[in-house]
């Protein structure tokens, strides 16, 4: 995922100056790199420990599988094509993808029947209400911090003590990794972004780079307990306990931490593509 979401404040303004489009494009290269590294880790582990393999599929079987999943693959084309063609913004693309996924699930794959829709909507509403309650409190805390000028005071304090951008980014990574142990990703972004952004700007750190850095940290947080959402999803699929899965996931977690170090200190990994597309202006 490229991590193109933008946190909003109490009145709907962005908590940083980075747009959704900038963050979306800035996440493409880091996303491809991280996916490749995780894939390499998977292949290496499978080769080293001789994991069982499925029999090689024939071209007829591959074509059949491709034909069956073509409707799902079209979702990527609709989202990216619609954004690049200017048909809708990245935020609107999320709504379009939800409508498309609903249509495909009900009328094409028929995994979901019309009778199931009210139950699914009720479950989604319940989960959304819980998340929105958390986000509301996070936004209020962020608003209070901003209104009291605490970020600006912290920025001035750090500059007075000669803190450079490298030290600051190391601190940001530690802070976000610790927060990822006990909090949900959206809450962390809403609380920390308004505080960290003014300091980062004064230290010469591009807000888009900071945004991508936060997204990578959030992804790491989703892969370790106790709040790691990806662990619970994988546990349900693999029928493994959380403790057992936590031990098994360490090679991939280590890979993500190594990549986090790379993307932290090489800003061009995230800034090159949006700059090449003219989305960053003169920055």
What are these regions (language model features)?
Residues 1-283:
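Alpha-helical transmembrane segments of multi-pass membrane transport proteins
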């Amino acid at each position: 995922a490229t991590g193109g979401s933008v946190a909003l404040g109490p009145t709907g303004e962005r908590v940083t100056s980075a747009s959704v489009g900038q963050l979306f494009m800035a996440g493409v290269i880091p996303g491809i790199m991280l996916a490749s590294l995780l894939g390499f880790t998977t292949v290496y582990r499978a080769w080293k420990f001789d994991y069982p393999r499925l029999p090689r599929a024939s071209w007829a079987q591959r074509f059949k599988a491709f034909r069956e999943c073509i409707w799902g693959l079209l979702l990527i084309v609709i989202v990216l094509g619609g954004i690049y063609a200017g048909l809708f913004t990245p935020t609107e693309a999320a709504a379009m993808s939800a409508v498309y996924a609903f249509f495909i699930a009900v009328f094409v794959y028929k995994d979901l029947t019309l009778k199931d829709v009210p139950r699914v909507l009720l479950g989604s509403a319940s989960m959304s209400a819980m998340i929105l309650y958390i986000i509301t409190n996070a936004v209020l805390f962020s608003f209070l911090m901003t209104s009291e000028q605490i970020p600006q005071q912290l920025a001035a304090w750090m500059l007075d003590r000669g803190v450079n951008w490298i030290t600051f980014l190391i601190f940001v990574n530690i802070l976000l990794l610790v927060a990822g142990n006990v909090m949900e990703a959206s809450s962390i972004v809403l609380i920390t972004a308004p505080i960290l952004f003014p300091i980062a700007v004064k230290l010469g750190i591009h807000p888009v780079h900071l945004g991508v850095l936060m997204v990578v940290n959030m992804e790491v947080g989703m892969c370790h307990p106790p709040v790691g959402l990806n662990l619970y999803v994988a546990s349900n699929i693999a029928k493994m306990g959380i403790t057992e899965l936590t031990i098994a996931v360490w090679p991939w977690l280590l890979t993500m931490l190594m990549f986090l170090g790379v993307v932290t200190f090489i800003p061009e990994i995230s800034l090159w593509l949006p700059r090449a597309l003219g989305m960053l202006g003169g920055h």
